[in-house]
């Protein structure tokens, strides 16, 4: 139900769903996801001796599409719902496998920053969370964000892992991701 609310909202706003594989080249994330996330990646070598990983997040993957598949297109509006994998200590609201719902605009022709923050907040509100806090002046731990600046939406009811959503501008685009597992913990939909 939560996913349907977000998909309906984004489809109405002109976004298209994209699917990308969970297994990625490990180098896709080098120098982009920060040293902490690099250390938590599940990596392995395949039969072709390529260094692969289970994707720890997807903005870095989508960012490469701005330079390749969508190189000649502007204002490409995409969303995705994909599984992420991180070798971190499981605790309340933090899992080794979790679902990321991401929203990206590739090769933007205008500054969508405020619009993306408003969309993220609106989606969270439509999912039955009314006690969220928007922080538009956050230093993000992911190296692909411009000046490491970004935004977060938090819910205090989640305790120490209170971030519901994070995003910002990066070379070739702007976007945010919502942790669906955390959103389900605080959503009033289905009560």
Identify the meaning behind each predicted range.
Residues 1-191:
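TRNA-recognition modules of translation machinery and tRNA-sensing kinases, especially anticodon-binding
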């Amino acid at each position: 139900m939560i996913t349907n609310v977000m998909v309906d909202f984004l489809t109405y706003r002109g976004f298209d769903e994209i699917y990308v594989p969970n297994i990625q080249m490990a180098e896709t994330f080098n120098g982009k996801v920060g040293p902490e996330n690099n250390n938590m990646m599940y990596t392995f070598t395949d039969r072709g001796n390529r260094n692969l990983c289970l994707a720890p997040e997807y903005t870095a993957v989508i960012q490469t599409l701005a330079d390749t598949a969508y190189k000649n297109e502007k204002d490409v509006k995409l969303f995705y719902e994909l599984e992420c994998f991180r070798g971190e200590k499981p605790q309340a609201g933090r899992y080794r496998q979790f679902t990321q719902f991401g929203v990206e605009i590739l090769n933007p022709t205008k500054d969508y920053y405020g619009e993306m923050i408003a969309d993220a907040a609106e989606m969270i509100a439509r999912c039955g969370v009314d006690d969220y806090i928007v922080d538009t002046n956050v230093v993000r731990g992911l190296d692909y964000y411009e000046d490491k600046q970004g935004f977060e939406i938090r819910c205090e009811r989640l305790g120490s892992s209170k971030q519901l959503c994070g995003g910002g501008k990066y070379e070739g685009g702007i976007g945010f991701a919502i942790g669906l597992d955390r959103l389900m913990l605080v959503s009033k939909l289905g009560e």
